[in-house]
């Protein structure tokens, strides 16, 4: 999750080394992910192909590839609340290169060349680096705010880290790893369909029994506390902040939501009158 704040801090370290000019091109390397088969098509864009939930995963991804717009009336118009929108308008490569250049310029660093995509040379010298937030933090952001692109990034990362010699698509490799893991935990995956790592699909399939088995395993696992903390709390935060308010359920469950046009779904944990989860 390379946000603008993390990127600014990282580039600031570069500037603190005394670097004020980079002779040559700004070259972005997106070769970490291999997605030879492309991504499954999703046509339900809500008449907004630039919506945040449609951002596709990429090794170039920075700041979720989003631009932030605020619209408000000046003194000539009727005063009222401002309108805020987040849109994805540029390719990952364009967005990342432009953002890096802009931040470097703000820091007083000039790049003399243009923007290119390429592979890092084997003899390149590492000057500085940054690391991702830990997995617990990433999963919390994914679940609390139902981030499709972050979930899909996670799937591709699983694939990239476990890619076999005969595999050339990290999406497919990641799905294979998940199926193998589930089967190893005793969960029958017959009929289950995972196609993109998020709920952004009309082809995904899972039975109620399979879902319940996965949740039961999660509840009894060594990482249950981390998973519980990542899920939205009824009527309190995340995607559940405004749902089931004043129903007597406030704070009484941790629920992951799902939403597509004409589809609503929830899954998670709560307690009954006998205090049973």
Task: Please name every model-derived segment.
Residues 55-57, 145, 149-150, 262:
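Short, solvent-exposed loop/turn segments at the edges of secondary structure
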Residues 64, 75-78, 271-274:
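Short acidic-glycine loop/turn motifs at beta-strand connectors
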Residues 49-51, 90, 130, 255-260:
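Short Gly/Pro-enriched turn/cap motifs at secondary-structure boundaries
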Residues 28-32, 44, 111-124, 233-235:
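Short, glycine/proline-biased beta-turn/loop segments that scaffold the active-site neighborhood
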Residues 177, 189-277:
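C-terminal soluble interaction/assembly domains
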Residues 69, 74-226:
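A small/polar active-site loop signature that marks catalytic segments
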Residues 1-58, 65, 109, 159-210:
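Mid-domain, small-residue-enriched loop/turn segments at the edges of structured enzyme/sensor domains
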């Amino acid at each position: 999750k390379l946000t603008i704040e993390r990127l600014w801090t990282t580039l600031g370290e570069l500037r603190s080394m005394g670097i004020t000019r980079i002779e040559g091109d700004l070259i972005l390397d997106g070769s970490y992910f291999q997605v030879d088969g492309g991504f499954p098509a999703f046509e339900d864009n809500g008449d907004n192909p630039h919506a945040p939930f449609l951002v596709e995963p990429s090794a170039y991804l920075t700041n979720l590839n989003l631009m932030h717009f605020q619209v408000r009336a000046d003194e000539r118009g009727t005063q009222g609340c401002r309108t805020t929108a987040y849109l994805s308008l540029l390719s990952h490569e364009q967005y990342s290169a432009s953002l890096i250049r802009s931040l470097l310029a703000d820091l007083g660093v000039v790049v003399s060349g243009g923007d290119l995509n390429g592979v890092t040379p084997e003899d390149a010298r590492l000057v500085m680096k940054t690391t991702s937030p830990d997995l617990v933090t990433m999963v919390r952001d994914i679940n609390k705010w139902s981030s499709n692109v972050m979930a899909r990034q996670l799937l591709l990362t699983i694939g990239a880290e476990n890619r076999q010699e005969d595999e050339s698509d990290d999406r497919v490799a990641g799905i294979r790893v998940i199926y193998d893991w589930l089967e190893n935990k005793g969960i029958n995956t017959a009929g289950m369909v995972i196609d993109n790592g998020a709920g952004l699909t009309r082809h995904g399939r899972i039975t109620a029994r399979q879902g319940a088995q996965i949740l039961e395993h999660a509840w009894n696992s060594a990482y249950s506390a981390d998973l519980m903390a990542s899920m939205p709390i009824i009527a309190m935060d995340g995607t559940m902040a405004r749902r089931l308010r004043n129903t007597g359920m406030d704070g009484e469950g941790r629920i992951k939501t799902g939403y597509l046009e004409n589809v609503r779904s929830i899954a998670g944990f709560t307690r009954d009158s006998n205090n049973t989860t």
